Curated annotation (Swiss-Prot):
The family this protein is said to belong to: Belongs to the activator 1 small subunits family. RfcL subfamily.
Segments passing through the bilayer: none
One function term, GO molecular function aspect: ATP hydrolysis activity
Gene3D superfamilies from the UniProt entry: 1.10.8.60, P-loop containing nucleotide triphosphate hydrolases
Organism for this UniProt entry: Pyrobaculum arsenaticum (strain DSM 13514 / JCM 11321 / PZ6)
Subunit-level organization: Heteromultimer composed of small subunits (RfcS) and large subunits (RfcL).
Lineage: Archaea, Thermoproteota, Thermoprotei, Thermoproteales, Thermoproteaceae
Signal peptide segment: none
Protein's recorded name: Replication factor C large subunit
């Protein structure tokens, strides 16, 4: 399998990490003030003198997904020649295990002549404070006693549960990448892959990535998969049209993985977002993603409330209510208190409802013709035909086959089909 481009083009040095200059200055100033680091690096990057930065015991990089938090730490370790001890909070479920792993990492000598060690707790907000017995306290204890740099990353460290961690660390916010920067990185990748990519096409990918460079690079790789060497705006449109289920998979994935309410809600601004389709897909994918009955029930409750808004909108045409419905259906389904940690890959199936509807499309068309014919000739509404007449005709047709024949002649639909419709 080809190397994912997010790995292939992961920045190796501090300078290669784009659009995060402020964070780089803060991080470098902290490292250079408190630990041993190469002079060249410090001269170039350690530009901050604030006491708060120089005195910090640990650094917590906060920001949305795919903006370079983890990459920045990897680049830092490489720049200063330190060995990186990387721990994912969810891998380390208990205080004992956490201390053991960090302790072992710090005790063992480095084989490759590193200048020191740096500990990275990736995604600390993935810690379930209740379940991960003592995990948070253990991290704080490690920070308090550590002689090596400790850095953490989090999408959302502003949950009150993480207050103690924020208090003891310097929180450095990384921003969403600008559209310009995303386009620039995509352009460079196109050149290096020998592909001709239209500026407009890259801009369109950048726009829908919402500042998440990882998502943008993944999209570009998908568009250029199979060795394709050109990318035009039309290609992007065509892929969207030909594979609506593909973009719906992406939409669902973004909704379920969104860390913040706003992030989930923003998906409705995406040009490919079709809320009617989304409702169908969400209905069938909630139990695929949320296995626990409680979480599942909260998600369904919110989706059903959104559906009540939709029902009202359809009845009264009060379209100004749509944003409320979408907030419930996107933010509400995505942000659930007991939300579990999601696996890296979720297999969202194609909704059965759509498959059944597609299979029965012809039969439904014939049924509509029949209903329309009866409604017009009997001077009644279509819903009356559906709820009453069809049933009565069905019973009559069983005892008198002429009824079916006459309907068949009048409608030009063969008699067997009429029988199955009644
Ligand atoms: N600022 C950046 N400069 C250059 N490349 C970046 C930047 N941000 C992200 N990338 C690209 O996106 C990929 C993912 O970035 P990274 O893992 O650092 O994101 P993250 O912010 O840690 O996200 P998450 O919170 O989901 O872990 C990188 O491998 C890199 O290719």
């Amino acid at each position: 399998m080809a190397l994912p481009w997010v790995e292939k083009y992961r920045p190796k040095s501090f300078a290669d990490v784009v659009d995060q200059e402020e964070a780089k200055y803060v991080l470098a100033s902290w490292i250079c003030a408190r630990f041993r680091a190469p002079k060249d690096f410090c001269t170039r990057w350690a530009k901050k003198k604030d006491k708060e930065i120089l005195d910090a015991r640990a650094v917590l990089l906060a920001g949305p997904p795919g903006v370079g938090k983890t990459t920045l730490i990897h680049a830092l370790a490489r720049e200063i020649g330190y060995e990186l001890i990387e721990l994912n909070a969810s891998d380390v479920r208990t205080a004992e295990r956490l201390k053991e792993v960090v302790g072992r990492g710090l005790r063992e000598g480095s084989l490759f002549g590193y200048g020191g060690k740096i500990v990275l707790f990736d995604e600390v907000d993935g810690l379930h404070v209740k379940e991960d017995a003592g995990g948070l306290e253990a991290i704080i204890e490690i920070i308090e006693n550590s002689k090596v740099p400790i850095v953490m990353t989090a999408n959302n460290p502003y949950d009150p549960r993480f207050r103690p961690l924020r208090d003891i660390s310097l929180v450095v916010n990384l921003k969403r990448l600008s559209e310009e920067e995303v386009v620039e990185v995509l352009r460079r990748i196109c050149t290096s892959e020998g592909a001709k990519c239209e500026e407009e096409a890259l801009r369109s990918i950048a726009k829908s990535s919402l500042g998440d460079l990882r998502a943008a690079i993944n999209d570009l790789q998908m568009y250029l998969s199979g060795g394709r060497k050109t990318l035009t705006v039309d290609d992007i449109k065509r892929v969207g049209e030909r594979n609506p289920q593909l973009s719906m998979f992406e939409i669902l994935d973004r909704v379920y993985r969104a860390r913040w309410f706003d992030e989930a809600r923003a998906i409705s601004f995406n040009p490919s977002f079709d809320w009617e389709q989304y409702f169908i897909w969400a209905t069938e994918t909630i139990p695929v993603v949320y296995k626990e009955i409680e979480t599942m029930s909260v998600a369904y409750d919110r989706l059903s409330k959104a559906d009540m808004f939709i029902g009202r909108i359809k009845r009264t045409q009060e379209w100004e209510l749509l944003p409320y419905a979408l907030e419930l259906a996107l933010g509400g389904v995505s942000q659930i208190k007991s939300k579990p940690r999601l696996p890296p890959f979720i297999k969202y199936g194609f909704p059965q409802r759509l498959l059944i509807l597609a299979k029965s499309r012809e039969a439904r068309k014939r049924r509509d013709v029949l209903v329309e014919y009866l409604a017009q000739n009997l001077h009644v509404s279509r819903s009356y035909v559906k709820s009453e007449i069809i049933y009565v005709l069905g019973v009559l047709a069983k005892s008198d086959s002429k009824i079916v024949e006459r309907l068949s002649k009048a409608l030009g639909i063969n008699a067997i089909d009429i029988k199955t419709l009644l």
